[in-house]
Amino acid sequence: MKWFNTLSHNRWLEQETDRIFDFGKNSVVPTGFGWLGNKGQIKEEMGTHLWITARMLHVYSVAAAMGRPGAYSLVDHGIKAMNGALRDKKYGGWYACVNDEGVVDASKQGYQHFFALLGAASAVTTGHPEARKLLDYTIEIIEKYFWSEEEQMCLESWDEAFSKTEEYRGGNANMHAVEAFLIVYDVTHDKKWLDRAIRVASVIIHDVARNNHYRVNEHFDTQWNPLPDYNKDNPAHRFRAFGGTPGHWIEWGRLMLHIHAALEARCEQPPAWLLEDAKGLFNATVRDAWAPDGADGIVYTVDWEGKPVVRERVRWPIVEAMGTAYALYTVTGDRQYETWYQTWWEYCIKYLMDYENGSWWQELDADNKVTTKVWDGKQDIYHLLHCLVIPRIPLAPGMAPAVAAGLLDINAK
């Protein structure tokens, strides 16, 4: 049974994409885009986070490129928010979180700033007159504070004044840096961003994870030595969970295939390890995380022996798994990846997609019942595009540039 690159399946993906776009519109608040609850309501107590606002700027840049009326206004709102309350006019960069009364968290987080970079780069594809200026400023901040020339890797975080950096290096922030760097490369054509993406992937995946059965280390010291026991006493941490986070493993796999495709588009021979490691990451996720306790779903975390730690099934890992399945099929032609893609869609239809309240449930327990152990509410819609739009575009250029270039469904029949 064939789904990939068929017009009939892509039409279904498009319908679901529009449903998700409509749900996300509820997140508009004066300071940016807010945290959505399970019924699409704003959770005012959560404040306005940079990472959500920047991701929604990216999302509606894609929607604008798809020709969705109203999306450009949301891009405009996102750019104004990035230049408004979230932006630190004194020290530069962006606060982690604000609300209507002022700054909630003044720290400068790499994870969040890399989404600012993604959002700004995606906005450039809409032709918004302020987008390139925002991107140039964001690049300046990234170059100055978050890219280490000495380490040739990304730093994790700073205090408000950019005077003290954290004695910690994070795989999650560096992964999203790779994602953003690829889009910056697409819109600027400056190859250093592609080179940086390759460098980061080579360290975290090819040098470390490959030698750890593709169980990706998330936490490192300042010398890039893994910290395997980090947060062992707080295993369900939203951003720094203990052990391995299989959703990140498989997400890394897709990013490496985007690098692979970007090199091919330059008529350069990609290193063989990009594809080999992408396969390894996919296989490790299936091996350790898919239904390890008898119930379907991808568990949130595992230990270093591959045993489940946090058994909740969070939404984004399986979404990323479907995007990576498509990417691997595109590169290899191996039908097993389409079979997994179909299996995972059946799971999502059965358990995750919420047609009554909108969007998808963010988290299920080990019995696939809705819960809030790790996440509360439905936050944003960013990850969902990775199973709804990625299967409709080439692997290079990246999402917003590809859609803006008219490449949506270019291979569909």
Curated annotation (Swiss-Prot):
Enzyme class, UniProt record, top EC level: isomerase
GO molecular function (one): mannose isomerase activity
Impact reported for residue 248 to A: Loss of activity
Reported effect, residue 383 to A: Loss of activity
pH dependency: Optimum pH is 7.
Catalytic temperature dependence: Optimum temperature is 47 degrees Celsius.
SUPFAM superfamilies named in the record: Six-hairpin glycosidases (SSF48208)
Effect of residue 320 to A: Loss of activity
Induction cue: Induced during growth with sulfoquinovose.
BP GO annotations: 6-sulfoquinovose(1-) catabolic process; 6-sulfoquinovose(1-) catabolic process to glycerone phosphate and 3-sulfolactaldehyde; carbohydrate metabolic process; protein hexamerization
Gene3D superfamilies given in the database record: 1.50.10.10
Catalysed conversion reaction: 6-sulfo-beta-D-quinovose = 6-deoxy-6-sulfo-D-fructose; 6-sulfo-beta-D-quinovose = 6-sulfo-D-rhamnose
Binding site for 6-sulfo-beta-D-quinovose: 55, 111, 172, 176, 238, 251, 362, 379, 383
EC number: 5.3.1.31
Subunit description: Homohexamer.
Known function: Catalyzes the isomerization of sulfoquinovose (SQ) to 6-deoxy-6-sulfo-D-fructose (SF). Can also catalyze the interconversion of SQ and sulforhamnose (SR). Has a clear preference for beta-SQ and little-to-no activity on alpha-SQ. In vitro, can also catalyze the interconversion of mannose, fructose and glucose, or lyxose and xylulose, but has extremely low activity with glucose.
Stated family: Belongs to the N-acylglucosamine 2-epimerase family.
Family annotation (PANTHER family): N-ACYLGLUCOSAMINE-2-EPIMERASE
Protein name: Sulfoquinovose isomerase
Organism: Escherichia coli (strain K12)
Gene designation: yihS
